Structure formats: C-alpha cells, structure tokens
C-alpha cells in the first residue's frame, strides 16, 4: 500500500509494556505491531521502558519509534517529551495532544469551549464527601450515570451506575485510580461508535454492540461476543458528518496523525463524544485493524501507514 522503501525508516523501536494498568494490552499490541512491521521488511525491535532506560534508544541507534504503550507515561505526554528530547521521531500525537487526550476532564473542557458535543458531567475529587456529592449529582444529571477515573484508558475502572445508592461506592472505587473522577450522564438510545483516524485514510465508523451493559475492559480485550458492525448501519451522509466531527474533536485537542474518537448517539441521532485515544490498542480485538481490514488494508499495511506519518515534516 505504501510503496515506501523500508530502509527509509531506519532502526525502529516498538515501545510496549510500560507500567500502567494497561500493560498486558500493550504487550500484546507491541508484539503484533513488531510482526507487522517486520513483515514489511522494516528493521523493528521491541523496547519496554519498564525494563530499560529510554536513553538506550539513542545509544543503540534507534531513529524512530512506534508507540504501542497504552495509558500512563506512554500516553500522557511523558514518553513523547523524552523522545522529542532525544530527537527520535514517533507515531501519534505530541506532548500536548497526548496529555490532553488521556485526561478526560480537560478533554471535555476543551470540547465544551470548541463546540464539540459531549455528555453533561460533574467532577468529584478524591477525598470529597462521596455521599453528599452523589446526592447532588443525581439531582443534577439523573440516572443512569457512568463513573470513570479521569486518566485511565481501556475502560479501566469505568462503572455504570443505575441507582443513587450505588453511586458513593462507585465514586470511592474510581478515586483509587485517579484523584479526579468524572461522572457522566449516560447517553441512551442510539448506540456506541468509534471513528478511527490514520492520516488521510478514510476508515469507516464502527458500531460497537457489547453483550453486557457497556463496552468495558472485558468486552474490549477478553470477550468474543462483542459485535463490531462495519458498515455501521448509518446513512452515508450521517456517517460522513460524524467522521467530520470526530476529526474536529481530535484536532482541537492538538492530537495528530492517528488515534480514535469514541462517541454515543442518542435516540434522535445526536452525537456525544466521550474521549479520544492517541495510542489505540492494536490487539486482535482492537478497532483500528478491524476498520482497516474492512476496506482491504492488512494489519501490516496499517502499521506501516501509521509509521510512515513520522516521515512527514
């Protein structure tokens, strides 16, 4: 697909593993990315920052990195800043886009100021009076609600709350993962979708139909009964407009090159954006490979396309 001489990429590190709650997902993503790059003849090697200092990248002659780290320092701008310091080109967003993209609270603040629709929400801080805040939030947002740590990915510690009595415990649990907790009004009626972004590729939307209550960690990476509908079933004009809004949701955060934007539709077909992902999973359950495969792009071709974006000025 790319027609790029593999030698142009030089020595490539596939960053994987790390120390976040998403380490196991990242290990799987990294190994598959490595195979995809090597299948294309690229000189790629695994590199786990949890086991080796980043300075080794420069010492060992790496000139480029495919970031398959998920969550934590791999996705919050820290790795990106270090790679900038060492002069190593890397996939995905830079420091600002990565930091904002992993922070659901500040993502939503930016979207509110730039006209990107997002569900109504409240924030709770670790140590707040959870019972009192729960009463206030239910009165303001109603039920059901989603409770999530502000800076975890892969739906780690995300809980759906259907009763007011269950909310204080959900707040307490989420606060063990992050000092800021997002409580979001549940958008019902139209389903969950994702828009995958990879440079100028026109990837189709995916409708996600989990067997359980919502698309949680188990549905994303373990279960085989989650349905991924491609095509998504929406009229072509509506799909095109939603992809346009998704790209805007990505761009206003300073995100670049590739990632995902997730959103819900209500019963009237209105979109509400939930989050972006600047270092999407690349496992056999992950969404970007599914979207690419549906239009005839292999896994190897997709990872080469993503890596090729690091050749741009």
Curated annotation (Swiss-Prot):
Its cofactor is Mg(2+); Mn(2+). Mg(2+) 2 binds at residues 275, 277. Cell wall formation. The keyword Cell division does not apply. Its EC number is 6.3.2.4. Gene3D superfamilies: 3.40.50.20, ATP-grasp fold, A domain (3.30.1490.20), ATP-grasp fold, B domain (3.30.470.20). PANTHER family: D-ALANINE--D-ALANINE LIGASE (PTHR23132), D-ALANINE--D-ALANINE LIGASE B (PTHR23132:SF23). Residues 108-308 form the ATP-grasp domain. This is D-alanine--D-alanine ligase. Pfam families: Dala_Dala_lig_C, Dala_Dala_lig_N. One of its GO terms (biological process) is cell wall organization. Pathway: Cell wall biogenesis; peptidoglycan biosynthesis. Belongs to the D-alanine--D-alanine ligase family. Binds 2 magnesium or manganese ions per subunit. It catalyses: 2 D-alanine + ATP = D-alanyl-D-alanine + ADP + phosphate + H(+). It is an enzyme of class 6 (ligase). One of its GO terms (molecular function) is D-alanine-D-alanine ligase activity. Mg(2+) 1 binds at residues 262, 275. Keywords: ATP-binding, Cell shape, Cell wall biogenesis/degradation, Cytoplasm, Ligase, Magnesium, Manganese, Metal-binding, Nucleotide-binding, Peptidoglycan synthesis. ATP binds at residues 138-193. One of its GO terms (cellular component) is cytosol. It is found in: Cytoplasm. InterPro entries: ATP-grasp, ATP_grasp_subdomain_1, D-Ala_lig_Van_CS, D_ala_D_ala, Dala_Dala_lig_C, Dala_Dala_lig_N, PreATP-grasp_dom_sf.
């Amino acid at each position: 697909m790319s027609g790029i001489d593999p030698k142009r990429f030089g020595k490539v590190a596939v960053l994987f593993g790390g120390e976040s709650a998403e380490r196991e997902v990242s290990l799987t993503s990294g190994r598959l990315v490595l195979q995809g790059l090597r299948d294309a003849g690229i000189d790629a090697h695994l590199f786990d920052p949890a086991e080796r200092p980043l300075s080794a990248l420069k010492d060992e002659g790496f000139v480029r990195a495919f970031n398959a780290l998920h969550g934590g320092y791999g996705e919050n701008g820290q790795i990106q800043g270090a790679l900038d310091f060492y002069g190593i080109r890397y996939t995905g967003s830079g420091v600002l886009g990565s930091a904002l993209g992993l922070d659901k609270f500040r993502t939503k603040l930016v979207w509110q100021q730039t006209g990107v629709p997002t569900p109504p929400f409240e924030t709770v801080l670790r140590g707040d009076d959870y019972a009192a805040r729960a009463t206030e939030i239910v009165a303001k947002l109603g039920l059901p609600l989603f409770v999530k740590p502000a800076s975890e990915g892969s739906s780690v510690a995300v809980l759906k709350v259907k009763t007011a009595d269950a909310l204080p415990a959900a707040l307490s649990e989420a606060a063990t993962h992050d000092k800021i907790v997002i409580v979001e009004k549940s958008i019902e009626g139209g389903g969950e979708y994702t828009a995958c972004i990879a440079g100028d590729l026109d990837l189709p939307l995916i409708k996600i139909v989990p067997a359980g209550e919502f698309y949680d960690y188990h549905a994303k990476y373990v279960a085989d009964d989650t349905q991924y509908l491609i095509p998504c079933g929406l009229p072509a004009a509506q799909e095109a407009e939603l992809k346009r809004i998704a790209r805007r949701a990505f761009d206003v955060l300073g995100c670049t090159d590739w990632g995902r934007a997730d959103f819900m539709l209500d019963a009237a077909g209105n979109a509400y954006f939930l989050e972006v992902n600047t270092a999407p999973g690349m496992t056999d359950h992950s969404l970007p490979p599914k979207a690419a495969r549906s239009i005839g792009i292999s896994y190897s071709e997709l990872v080469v396309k993503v890596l090729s974006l690091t050749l741009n000025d």
